[in-house]
Amino acid sequence: TKRKPQYMKVEAFEHILDQIKPYTDYLYFHVKGEPLLHPHIDTFLDISHEKGFQVNITTNGTLIPKVKEKIILKPALRQINISLHSMGGNKDYDHKDDYMEHIQEFIKEVREKSDVIISLRQWDLDEKTIPERGIKIADKVYLNQDYQFKWPDLGAEEDDGIGFCYGLRNQIAVLVDGTVVPCCLDGEGVINLGNINESRFSEILEGPRTKAIIEGFSRQYAVEELCRKCGYRKRFNK
């Protein structure tokens, strides 16, 4: 991301949860960020539980050995998605040989101590490989495979815009600075629907740009330029 690196403050997180509570019971900690980097990840999980939310964490898994004791027994934690494919593009990680061993140890510990679901993601298949989705490896442990996709980018080639997406229907994202965007792929905040620190979440949902996106996809059309340059959206057209 080109945005300034920063950690969401605990007070801001509490405010966001109070705003979104009428609309969902589930939180997903990601959006082009590594949630296990946050120094207060345990506090965030505690607050989530206090306010009645279940949490899904998406991580590349490299920090699991360091922070597992802060998260593994938290009652709010519902599922951990581990992006195995992230290792393919991480040239700076010095412990690749130990990576899978640490993941396996973590899975064993999770199964012994909790009911948390583990999803191992391998989203780097090429077109010659047919993915098998939702392979059950063990109780509450799954392997999910899929093709590589291109992240939306205003500099990318634009398609005809025809198609559907679940953005704003079953997901919405709040960035660290409070910017609200339609989905977790808009990590740069290009489609800025408003700021949850400045406007009520209910007002942002009723905003003209928000409504235009929803109505557009109801007609099978992407009204936003970034959406017309999103490779992930094409998955829903198959």
What function would you assign to each model-found segment?
Residues 1-80, 91-97, 237:
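Conserved alpha-helical substructure of the radical SAM core
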Residues 174-175:
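Short, acidic, Ser/Thr-enriched surface-loop or helix-capping motifs
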Residues 17, 21, 68-89, 132-151:
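Structural recognition of alpha->loop->beta junctions
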Residues 95-109:
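Well-ordered, non-membrane alpha-helical segments in soluble/globular domains
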Residues 108-160, 185-235:
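C-terminal accessory region of radical SAM enzymes
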